[in-house]
Regions:
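Active-site hotspot residues in diverse enzymes, especially metal/ion-binding acidic/histidine motifs
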Residues: 1-145
Length: 145
């Protein structure tokens, strides 16, 4: 299993950002926001070029989560698969989806946010960060979450 937490930290430190769109740009991954119906986002590779598509009908916080999730696929699974899509029911379906979601949570929610608020519930962290509770379940900080 890929260490998604370490991968997210290395990229964030290397490029001095945790913004998934900025990171995608640094990594040569093309991003596009547009209507995708019921699909939240997808990542695909065509002739060695990586593309991330994000549903424009989602709120900005969810778009950022989707961008980070799909970037996780682009950087961690480029040799395993060539197409991933994220739909609301796809969070726990296989190793690659779990790794991509873990990467996204680790990228977008720094450990310091959790450590500075000991005892916060997932609900409270959700209100603080603006990210959904089911997303925050993938964040791991020394046994706190």
């Amino acid at each position: 299993m890929i260490d998604a937490k370490r991968t997210a930290a290395e990229l964030s430190n290397m490029y001095h950002t945790n913004d998934p769109i900025d990171l995608a740009d640094h990594l040569g991954v093309y991003t596009q926001v547009g209507p995708l119906g019921k699909i939240y986002g997808c990542c695909l590779t065509i002739a060695g070029e990586r593309f991330i598509y994000i549903n424009s009908d989602l709120d900005k916080s969810t778009q950022k989560m989707v961008a980070a999730h799909e970037l996780g696929h682009a950087v961690m699974h480029q040799e395993d698969y060539f197409f991933f899509n994220w739909m609301p029911d796809s969070l726990h379906r296989n190793r690659a989806e779990i790794e991509a979601h873990t990467f996204a949570a680790e990228l977008l929610v720094p450990d310091s946010v959790v450590l500075e608020h000991p005892g916060f519930t997932l609900s409270q962290l959700s209100a603080l960060t603006g990210y959904a509770e089911n997303f925050l379940k993938f964040k791991k900080v020394g046994g706190v979450l």
